[in-house]
């Protein structure tokens, strides 16, 4: 029979009394009235705040979106399969936040920054709110530094600056994602941190982008935030804000960041789905009334900070998909009005073999020209006018049988300019290479080269410049200008190469 030791019992009781804490925990709780389709209606939670995180009995997290008189409408982040009518819900008193830090570089994460690449946990010491206010007017400065995309047509005609928001818009399968990925690849060695946000994409497409970035060594300075087509609507809605939050962390440390949102049409569709299930009144195209605010509060977070805040920047490249080239639909017009310009890709140009399929006529950059390098400004000044004139003449030439010599020359020049702006995917060019190609095109060096041989001439000239005249590239890349010395070297190189090229062709 065990012996009872009173001294031990009294010691334990004393310890329990000493450790007793009178502090009461008051929780704001409610009960689930209805659940389904990723939406829960909850009774109670009288003191809940808009966008507050809610915790369900099974551990599922929700966000309170509709605060009504007798119930709260919440979206579920997760499957919510184990939530039943009558389940207890607790308000957490917190707003959605994610861990941020250098440890995210090279990783693929979901919109809550949980790793999904199988490379183990991510250890971040800091957290940031997913929804945070954009920098104010006094915190910004105007865009003045170029963000080189490596795509000649963009850097010459529609230049982008650090801190700008440039929309990439076009039908499906016109090369929108390719443009964005090329831009990320071109940031290698430029000290720019890139965030690629995939919203509602097929898993195979996301895997393809990650593979390309890994193969080219771009994942060292990139982060991929993925909310695939099979992700719940709330995660597709949150994904762009997660990308912006990660970029903000680096921006406020004085670093340069680039965020690609691929694509905001699918985010708007996910938000429409949530809003209709929450019984919010539908507006144009069944989108809710605040769909403009959905995108404006996201894109306004892109900025070029002033010197007091460290001169960091966040450049945004939102992508929007159109139906049958209709840029006057609701979401495209909204995003066009928010951004600082757009790059319009056309399926007709793409099918005609002009890739990147940029329609130079309606593509604009409202602030990027201030950030264009002097070297590019010097050579690209006339190319836009010449291309516009070529398009007009091309339409006219279809109906006219006999054209005067000047018109024929202009058409021939335009064809060659169009040819030099063609570029294969995943092969961005450096500034000195772009300047050399445009210089050769606008100064008439290609006028007597057959159109079908312009592409091989271009490739040959670039390799010849790199091997025979490396000083040209050194001058342009170090000064960002086409100095008199560099121009003389370039003229000599083009003349030498052209002579050998024509001799071989003959």
From Swiss-Prot:
It is an enzyme of class 7 (translocase). ATP binds at residues 170-177. GO terms for cellular component: plasma membrane-derived thylakoid membrane; proton-transporting ATP synthase complex. Keywords: ATP synthesis, ATP-binding, CF(1), Hydrogen ion transport, Ion transport, Membrane, Nucleotide-binding, Thylakoid, Translocase, Transport. It holds the Pfam family ATP-synt_ab_C. It is found in: Cellular thylakoid membrane. InterPro entries: ATP_synth_asu-like_sf, ATP_synth_asu_C, ATP_synth_asu_C_sf, ATP_synth_F1_a_nt-bd_dom, ATP_synth_F1_asu, ATPase_a/bsu_AS, ATPase_F1/V1/A1_a/bsu_N, ATPase_F1/V1/A1_a/bsu_N_sf. GO terms for molecular function: ADP binding; ATP binding; proton-transporting ATP synthase activity, rotational mechanism. Coiled coil: none annotated. Its EC number is 7.1.2.2. It is a peripheral membrane protein. It catalyses: ATP + H2O + 4 H(+)(in) = ADP + phosphate + 5 H(+)(out). The record marks 363 as: Required for activity. CDD domains: ATP-synt_F1_alpha_C, ATP-synt_F1_alpha_N, F1-ATPase_alpha_CD. F-type ATPases have 2 components, CF(1) - the catalytic core - and CF(0) - the membrane proton channel. CF(1) has five subunits: alpha(3), beta(3), gamma(1), delta(1), epsilon(1). CF(0) has four main subunits: a(1), b(1), b'(1) and c(9-12). Belongs to the ATPase alpha/beta chains family. Produces ATP from ADP in the presence of a proton gradient across the membrane. The alpha chain is a regulatory subunit. This is ATP synthase subunit alpha. It comes from Synechococcus sp. (strain JA-3-3Ab) (Cyanobacteria bacterium Yellowstone A-Prime).
